[in-house]
Swiss-Prot record, chain A:
Its main location: membrane. GO terms for cellular component: adherens junction; cilium; cytoplasmic vesicle membrane; cytoskeleton; cytosol; endoplasmic reticulum membrane; endoplasmic reticulum tubular network; endosome. This is Ras-related protein Rab-10. Mg(2+) binds at T23, T41, D64. Its EC number is 3.6.5.2. Ubiquitinated upon Legionella pneumophila infection. Ubiquitination does not lead to proteasomal degradation. Phosphorylation of Thr-73 in the switch II region by LRRK2 prevents the association of dRAB regulatory proteins, including CHM, CHML and RAB GDP dissociation inhibitors GDI1 and GDI2. Phosphorylation of Thr-73 by LRRK2 is stimulated by RAB29 and RAB32. Phosphorylation by LRRK2 is required for localization to stressed lysosomes. A motif (Switch 2) lies at residues 64-81.
Length: 200, 1088
């Protein structure tokens, strides 16, 4: 019973156009709740959640970013250090899907090279308003060699699965380490410095 | 695998003398006595330790005798006494083996010494080993002992005991090297020279010592830890005894490994060279070679730490291996007398010399460790009764289903975060949510065997008439009364009785041995039904001696604690002081056991567990409480009448418990069997010896805890081996069993709630406003927008932080005040965003290269980031616009579309007026003309012109008039207009005398012709402005009688505005300033 509370810390990032439901996806995963009122995220928020995978306790620190275009240059600076990035679009919003390739380019430019990526087509409960067929999502994911899920934060479809899958993929790439390994920072707790550490 | 207990069995040391002194030391450290008390006796052989009444008189020492001295006169003759000196009587014919002093007023504890002239020595203590590093300041230079453990070296089928000692060498601060010293040791190793160096393994970069799990063998709780030692040259397998001791050792070794940091130099191990000779002469290995020394080594140098490398180091290791973790003495190891003790040691040896091992000794007591486990090969009648052979038992143990995982990790795991502690404490709090009570049957038995070997089948005691219990707790006392058992903590009886018990366990079930623990004659065995083995964890065993001098193991207790499912259980077997009148001693023994029995916890940061900190305590043993106040015949008569109730009243245990002197909170079942002591061996007859002891219920079983039901409590008259009868009790004990699903659920809830807590502890604030619009921003006109930060429940530090690749957190024209701060929970702070466009930022805003647009990042330390958007519109102004742009602006600047301004502002400055551009221009900016003309009209005689400041409000008015072309409405003081003119010149992005001409001007300063030449090279508009201004200034000077201006004043004011250093606003050198003034002055006094 005397196990460590968590062995690893994974930093995940949610990106995608404004209004696709990134915050709701995170809220569903972290608090298992959903809020219909839309409050645009103006800034960077994060939550933690501890999960157990393959007998390892993993602390996920999930960063939610502002999706509005005017913040893009700033938000890309948060990509660095993320081990996994969830790129979210809205299946009822064609524009958000078209922007996927732009977001992917952003990842290429700003994220760590070995970052684990995942594509989510959110709001899949709203099938009557769907404008992006599932196949298109699958296709672009296939082209880029990344995983794809259609999710619904509202109906709680695939949310947990998506996060766990992403964490598992990261875990698979993480070399087996002794608990005391220093490669993984387990001491920082909720410590977040943004890019502050770089400059001052 | 059952080598597990070889640490108890293996003949490791323990000279009575050493122990006595050590115990004495330890005790006195605990309770310093004003008067020294020492044992004082002469005794021979077993008499010395069997019963206190035969020896061990206590004597009060004379005032000047501060030391206790113990002397071994011959191998069987011992003497103890008070002594005035610590050094012993060196030079006398006998060997003063050990001495100790302990109390004031003598100068510090005088070490004991039976060891050597070397720096190290046998130090002692009961129990296990831990070494204190701080006493390592000893010689030789920086050579220290860290840890040692006794283990079994496995090579193929061979098993040999080795002492493993981790030795650290620290030649200087910050540098250290380690080596693992492996020692052979003589079976009943007592002193350092019973130990010989086998080999040294340097802890180099390729050194690893890791726990391994042999294929096909399942991990058994409490079983040996198998470790593999690997270096480039070596591959050795050791089995180390289970427990915290080994754990510590492995951790120490792991810490000693140099790692792969390339910064640290490779260890060189030069210090090991002095031991090389022993390595080079493997043929001389062994304690018996050349009387245990290697002359060629001993004579190498004074600083050698050892006789033959093995001697004193080995001795230290012996001590290390057995040293107690609870009581330790900080002996100084000086003045040691190695030679003498070595001599004593050699006297002790078999005179025949060459014998390789003690199994050849005539008394046959010293079986080799490995051989002792093959007892069933001997033609022993024991084997015929059994229905299970030893090997079967072992197999069962092997096949039990405990997995390796957890314990193995614990070995290397040290970090326990706060979160972990919280999870654990929550789990304890919510235990009821995920556990249910399930009854398990416990068999508890106690048997004082009076030093006998098993001669009868134990089944009547252990398994007749009962269902197969889930757990067996079987305790023995007086297992072995021989000298060896006492001195050397080694007895073949352990194996014999272990086997006898194992063979007589209930035939309907298979059992796995969990643990065996023994202190001299007190042994406790714990078995579990094989199917429950997986639910036993955290097994620890400890011993407490309360015998001779309050510490020796002839009396005392042993205990095993473990976790069964989720219930913690402690089983104690004790043998308390004898004799009817000694009940107070028994009470004290009980209390000592309770207070001194301490179990290490898995988490080393937690304090050790005591007996009382367990859910269930089962206490068995020969408690030795007697029936008093009745004469023997009366007792026997009452027994015959089965009038046990009458007898209870006289039972000391009952009366002492009733008086709450002992066993508080414990319960004992009703005694429905006749006293179990004392019988003539082999019969059911009461003691017919001379002493004719009165019968007594010596052997008892008590319990404490919830959900315990005693099903039976009885003696077993059928067994006649001993002068005691065995007692047994069967319990149903309600154990907290984990419902895995509920446990997972509870754990999940706890983790969720901790996550929630952690999320709630992320600093978070609310902002009254996030979007800021600054409307109609004008040149040099401050605009302020404010907002409040309202903090949540977590104290937090906030700060506006720089965006990537930017040098400040916002644009130059903006400022947040304050830009950082600290907020208490629920507190509020007002932040003002101040927007101010000055000469540095105006031009780009005019041109549209910059906009009133910015995003500020408000960062909370350890928390979120908030983006604040700033936007607005800037009203272009003539201030900050280039001269040539203004010359093309025929309309007021604010009447023009932004695009036109932008184009004109970005238009390159032409040095040659080639006329290809717009023809439609003015010679000088109309705004300049307006201001100068105003001054010419109104201020030509104004005193202090350019020297008295204007009014801010009037400046804004002037600016607006200029920018909107409404100068006819201009009404402002002369000073304000004058200042506006200066500001206008100052805010020109390119000064009137272009940057490129700056150095030329300074050079020609003083040469008017050359100066005029430089001016003529200026772009037309600039030249026009310069000429115009000079003309105006000359006009002013004409009125100097009225306005008191002179050339110097004007030159100094305008010099720095018209001539600006291209390097920016660095502080100008006075010489440079002077030259600039002089340059202007020329034009003030000369007409062109």
């Amino acid at each position: 019973m005397a196990k460590k509370t968590y062995d690893l810390l994974f930093k995940l990032l949610l990106i995608g156009d404004s209004g696709v439901g990134k915050t709701c996806v995170l809220f569903r995963f972290s608090d298992d709740a959903f809020n219909t009122t839309f409050i645009s995220t103006i800034g960077i928020d994060f939550k933690i959640k501890t999960v157990e995978l393959q007998g390892k306790k993993i602390k996920l620190q999930i960063w939610d970013t502002a999706g509005q275009e005017r913040f893009h240059t700033i938000t890309t600076s948060y990509y660095r250090g993320a081990m996994g990035i969830m790129l979210v679009y809205d299946i009822t919003n064609g524009k958000s899907f078209e922007n996927i390739s732009k977001w992917l380019r952003n990842i290429d430019e700003h994220a760590n090279e070995d970052v684990e990526r995942m594509l989510l087509g959110n709001k899949c409960d709203m099938d009557d308003k769907r404008v992006v067929p599932k196949g298109k999502g699958e296709q672009i994911a296939r082209e880029h060699g990344i995983r794809f899920f259609e999710t619904s934060a509202k109906a709680n479809i695939n949310i947990e699965k998506a996060f766990l899958t992403l964490a598992e993929d990261i875990l698979r790439k993480t070399p087996v380490k002794e608990p005391n390994s220093e490669n993984v920072d387990i001491s920082s707790g909720g410590g977040v410095t943004g890019w502050k550490s770089k400059c001052c | 695998m059952s080598v597990a207990n070889s640490s108890h069995r293996a003949a490791l040391l323990r000279v009575l003398l050493i122990l006595l002194v050590a115990q004495n030391l330890a005790r006195c450290q605990l309770t310093p006595a004003p008067v020294q008390i020492c044992h004082s006796f002469h005794c021979f052989g077993e008499m010395c330790y069997q019963e206190a009444e035969f020896a061990n008189q206590i004597a009060e020492c004379e005032p000047e005798e501060h030391h206790c001295e113990l002397i071994q006169l011959t191998t069987v003759h011992y003497m103890a006494r008070c002594s005035p000196r610590c050094e012993g009587e060196i030079g006398t014919s006998y060997s003063p083996c050990l001495l100790a002093n302990n109390s004031a007023p003598s100068p510090g504890p005088c070490s004991l010494q039976c060891c050597s002239g070397g720096p190290l020595c046998l130090v002692l203590s009961l129990g296990h080993l831990t070494i204190q590093e701080d006493k390592l300041v000893l010689t030789p230079p920086a050579l220290v002992r860290n840890q040692a453990v006794q283990g079994v070296l496995c090579e193929g089928d061979s098993r040999q005991s080795r002492l493993l000692g981790l030795v650290r060498y620290r030649p200087e601060r910050g540098v250290q090297e380690h080596a693992l010293f492996l020692y052979n040791h003589r079976r009943m190793a007592i002193t350092g020279d019973d130990v010989s160096l086998d080999q040294i393994v340097p802890v180099s970069r390729d050194f690893t010592l890791e726990e391994v799990f042999p294929d096909g063998e399942l991990y058994i709780l409490g079983s040996d830890v198998t470790v593999q030692l690997d270096t480039a040259e070596l591959n050795l397998i050791f089995q180390l005894p289970f427990g915290s001791h080994t754990r510590t050792f492995l951790q120490e070794v792991a810490r000693a490994c140099p790692g792969f940091n390339p910064e640290t130099p490779d260890p060189e191990f030069l210090w090991l060279s002095r031991y090389k000779c022993t390595e080079q002469k493997p043929s001389q290995r062994g304690w018996n070679s050349a009387s245990g020394t290697w002359p060629e080594c001993t004579r190498k140098g004074e600083d050698q730490p050892s006789i033959g490398g093995g001697g004193s180091w080995g001795g230290a290791l012996l001590e290390a291996v057995q040293a107690g973790r609870s009581e330790r003495c900080d002996e100084e190891l000086e003045g040691a007398d190695w030679e003498m003790s070595a001599a004593a040691g050699s006297r002790e040896r078999d005179p025949a010399g060459g014998s390789q091992s003690d199994d050849l000794r005539p008394d046959g007591k010293g079986l080799l460790v490995d051989q002792s486990f093959r007892g069933q090969d001997k033609p022993d009648s024991l084997l015929t009764r059994q229905n299970k052979s030893k090997s079967e038992i072992t197999d069962m143990v092997r096949s039990s289903t405990i997995t390796v995982s957890d314990k193995a990790h614990i070995l290397s795991m040290q970090k326990f975060g706060l979160r972990d502690t919280m999870v654990k404490s929550h789990l304890v709090q919510k235990e009821e949510d995920y556990t249910y009570i399930q009854n398990f049957r416990f068999f508890v038995g106690t048997y004082n065997v009076n030093g006998q070997s098993p001669k009868e089948c134990l089944q009547p005691w252990l398994s007749h008439g009962i269902q197969a219990p889930d757990i067996y707790c079987v305790g023995f006392q007086e297992l072995d009364l021989s000298k060896e058992a006492f001195f050397f903590h080694d007895t073949p009886k352990e194996e014999e009785w272990f086997k006898a018990v194992s063979e007589s366990l209930h035939p309907d079930a298979k059992y796995a041995k969990v643990k065996l623990i023994r202190l001299v004659g007190i042994m406790l065995l714990l078995y579990v039904k094989q199917e429950h083995a997986a639910h036993i964890s955290e097994v620890e065993a400890e011993t407490v001696g309360t015998g001779i001098m309050g510490r020796m193991g002839n009396k005392g207790g042993v205990a095993i604690r473990f976790q069964f499912h989720n219930t913690s259980i402690c089983v104690v077997n004790s043998h308390l002081a004898a004799h009817t009148e000694e009940y107070e001693r028994r009470n004290q023994d009980y209390k000592d056991i309770c207070s001194r029995m301490q179990f290490c916890q898995v988490d080393p940061s937690l304090p050790p567990l005591t007996i009382s900190k367990h859910d269930v305590i089962l206490w068995l043993g020969d408690l030795n409480y007697r029936i008093e106040e009745l004469d023997v015949e009366k007792v026997k008569k009452l027994i015959e009448e089965k009038a046990f109730h009458t007898l209870y009243a006289y039972d000391q245990l009952k009366t002492q418990v009733a008086a709450k002197a002992i066993f508080e909170g414990f319960t004992e079942g009703e005694l429905t069997f006749q006293p179990t002591y004392k019988y003539d061996a082999g019969s059911d007859e009461w003691d017919t010896s001379e002493k004719c002891r009165a019968p007594a219920w010596c052997d008892r079983i008590l319990w404490k805890g919830k959900n315990i039901t005693q099903l039976s409590y009885q003696s077993h008259m059928a067994l006649k081996t001993s002068d005691h009868k065995p007692v047994s009790s069967v319990f149903d004990i309600g154990v907290k069993v984990i419902n895995e699903e509920l446990y997972r659920k509870t754990l999940e809830e706890i983790v969720r709630s901790l996550d929630k807590m952690e999320n709630a502890n992320i600093p978070s604030v609310s902002l009254s406003k996030r979007e800021f619009f600054f409307q109609n921003v004008k040149y040099m006109q401050l605009q302020v927008e404010s907002f409040t930060i309202h903090n949540g429940q977590v104290p937090c530090q906030f700060e506006f932080i720089n965006k990537p690749d930017e040098e400040s957190y916002c644009k130059q024209w903006l400022n947040a005040n304050p830009s950082r701060g600290f907020l208490l929970p629920d507190s509020t702070i007002k932040i003002e965003l101040e927007l101010f466009v000055n000469k540095t930022t105006a031009t780009k805003l005019n041109s549209g290269e910059d906009k009133i647009e910015d995003i500020l990042v408000l960062h909370l330390d350890r928390g979120k980031d908030y983006f604040l958007s700033v936007s607005g519109n800037y009203l272009p102004s003539c201030f900050g616009s280039p001269i040539h742009t203004l010359c093309y602006l025929k309309e007021p600047i604010l009447d023009l579309p932004l695009k036109a301004i932008r184009e004109l502002t970005l238009m390159p400055l032409q040095t040659e007026d080639d006329g290809s551009q717009l023809k439609n221009h003015m010679d000088i900016p109309k705004e300049l003309w307006m201001m100068v003309d105003y001054l010419y009209q109104n201020a030509i005689q104004q005193e202090d012109l350019f020297q008295q400041p204007g009014l801010r409000s009037e400046f804004e008015h002037i600016r607006d008039c200029l920018d909107t072309g409404t100068t006819d409405t201009l009404s402002a003081s002369n000073h304000s207009v004058a200042e506006a003119l200066l500001l206008f010149l100052e805010s020109l992005p390119e000064p009137v005398i272009c940057y490129s001409a700056y150095h030329n001007c300074l050079e020609c300063s003083g040469n008017y012709t050359a100066s005029k030449q430089v001016i003529s090279t200026l772009p037309t508009f600039h030249k026009n402005v310069f000429d115009y201004l000079m003309k105006f200034l000359r006009e002013l000077l004409k009125n100097s009688a009225k306005n008191h201006l002179d050339g110097n004043i004007l030159a100094s004011i305008f010099g720095s505005l018209l001539l600006r250093n291209p390097a920016g606003h660095q502080k100008l050198e006075i010489a440079e300033k002077k030259k600039a003034q002089e340059f202007i002055r020329q034009f003030l006094y000369n007409s062109p």
